[in-house]
Amino acid sequence: SRGLGDVYERQGLEDHRVQFTPDVMPADILGFNMYQKNTGEFVYYPGTIMCNLFLADEINRTSPKTQSALLEVMEEGRVTVDGVSREVPKPFIVMATQNPKGSAGTQLLPESQLDRFMICMSMGYPDLESEIAIAKGKSTAAGFGELRAVLQAQQLVDVQAQVENVYVHDSIYAYITNLMNKTRNSNYIELGVSPRGTIACVRMAKAWAFLQGREYVIPSDVTDIFMDIAKHRIVPNTKARVAHVTEEAILSQIIADTRQPASYMEKVD
C-alpha cells in the first residue's frame, strides 16, 4: 500500500488510506455537512473517499454499516450525503485488504459488497528467495523512493479509454456468458456469479489483452483472469464444503468443461 501511494503521488494523483477499525463511521468515508453559524448554511466537508486511489485496509474489521458506505461510490463513482450527490475525482480506484475468514474481530463482507470488487487476489506467503530478501532488509520502505511514475493522471484516463475500445467478438461474449451460467448451475455452488461479474470479466479480459499488446480479446485472456474475477463471487454449497471442494477446483472444472470459441477475430464494422 505504501508503494501504491508513492506511485500515485508521483502521478499527481491523490491517495487516501483508511484503517477500517470497528469505530470508523460512514461519515468518515463519505464526508458530512456541518452547520455554519456565521452564514446560516450547511457546508460539506469531504470524506476520505474523495481521492483517486482509496485503500480500505482490513475492510472486514469494521461494521457492516460502514462497509455499505462504499456501495454507491464503487458502482456509480459518486457519493450522496443528505440527498446531495457529488462525483469523485477521475480516475478513481478502490482497493481493499481483508483478514482471513474467521479471524478475531472480523465481519464477513456481504455478497453485494464483494460483487463490486472487480478482482480478488490472495497474496499468500513470499517464496524462499523473496523472504530472504525481506529478512535482509532489501524490500523496505527505503526502496519506495526509487519508484517513478510512467503515466500522469490524464494519461491514465486515456489508457482506460483505450482499454474500453479493445475489440470483443460475439463468440467471446458467448464464451464468457457460458462460463458465468455454469457457475449458476453447478452442483457445488449455492450462489453463482452475477451479471455484474459478467461485465467485470469482459472489462478485465479487455485490460489483460491490452497489456499483452493486442487490440482484441482471445479465449486465453478470459481463462487467465476468470479465477480472479469469479472466486470471490461464488458461494460453495454444503455438498462442496463436506467434500472439501475448493472454489479454485470448482472454477477450474468449469473452465475445462466449457468449449472455447474457434473464431474470435473477425471484426464487423
Residue ranges and their predicted role:
Residues 1-8:
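Short, small-residue-biased leader/transition segments that mark boundaries at the very start
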Residues 10-37:
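AAA+/P-loop NTPase substrate/partner-engagement loops
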Residues 14, 52-53, 232:
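The start of beta-strands in P-loop NTPase/AAA+ ATPase cores
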Residues 36-41, 61-66, 74-151, 156-166, ...:
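Canonical AAA+ ATPase core
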Residues 36-55:
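Conserved alpha-helical scaffold flanking the Walker A/P-loop in AAA+ ATPase domains
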Residues 57-58, 69:
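Walker B catalytic acidic pair
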Residues 146-201:
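Conserved AAA+ ATPase small/helical "lid" subdomain
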Residues 185-269:
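C-terminal engagement/docking regions of AAA+ P-loop ATPases
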